[in-house]
């Protein structure tokens, strides 16, 4: 068993940003474990632009954004292992992994950062009726086939789900010569960013059918068509069926944080996000185990992933240098009146720096509301927002000094503007 200071599980955007921040914060013995054949994670197949506006103040493609961090990792001489699968994470932070070169090996780090990212919700989790023919892909799989493998999955396409990947693939398939017939969304609102709806659907004349879902798939060897129906109260409305002749169905029905390792180690998970429940330092219930990026909760922009992961790297460095976290009272963070979840779920005011960052999503579309944060019964933050939607994550930065004092909880809520 080898002793190291910091092990980062995952070499995607979160893992890279965390490693760079930890090294700059003084941690020398860092090891990144990545199961793929190259660093960068999902960014390597995201060849569209729109990345880096917050982090680098310029517009980059996914591979360009990843390359900026990979370059920093190499310049800082941070060690990493590719084609390495982490098999187990124990409660005492022992990491068991294997690869072709080293075989089966174990590491005992002082701290661990979870940066495994997320995966797409598959067809089996959607309970779509019909046959199981060829031609049904998750949007991310189709993205990899088109952008990295040079294969076009189909010619006539219907997309179920209006998440950002689905919207982007509607545009990408159109640019590659396919005909995207429509994007169907179960909810009465889109799950993606407004800018993606405009740039990927409106600009290409692709219809977005809200409150619709797939009720049947035709075809045995290959998809020959699908049937959509309008949805009310979560159920298809009889008599509203529409048939589309297509050879491909892409699924963009949400992302699931990949937390099998976390669960095996005993990390407490947030039932809403599916990711670890963390405090203001992005530390889980296991001391010295931190989480950041899409393994924690699904983000809209990779810039926010990098920002969050850098904070996790800095907190891990402080934990390693101090040998543990400082003591202090712990305040739960509660959600009310339309706030779906928050990260973090607990705050230790005495352990926070100058500011505490709260990230959250709402559970529906709200107009002319005010975001309010209470410490006990005292309002310590408020901001008016003309529109709030589930597809866009909200960020609130609180002064840590306002969190100290009487009161048994922090409450994030929506009020009339």
Where do the PLM segments sit?
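Rossmann-like nucleotide/phosphate-binding core characteristic of flavoprotein oxidoreductases
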Residues: 1-5, 82, 317-417
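Beta1-alpha1 glycine-rich phosphate/pyrophosphate-binding loop at the start
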Residues: 4-68, 144, 153-197
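FAD-site-proximal beta/loop scaffold in flavoenzymes
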Residues: 114, 136-146, 248-299
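Hydrophobic alpha-helical scaffolding
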Residues: 56-59, 63, 132, 187, ...
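A Rossmann-like FAD-binding core segment of flavoenzymes
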Residues: 68-97, 174-260, 354-386
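FAD-binding core/adjacent interface of flavoenzyme oxidoreductases
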Residues: 1-9, 67-156, 232-239, 250, ...
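A conserved FAD-binding loop/helix module that cradles the flavin
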Residues: 292-336
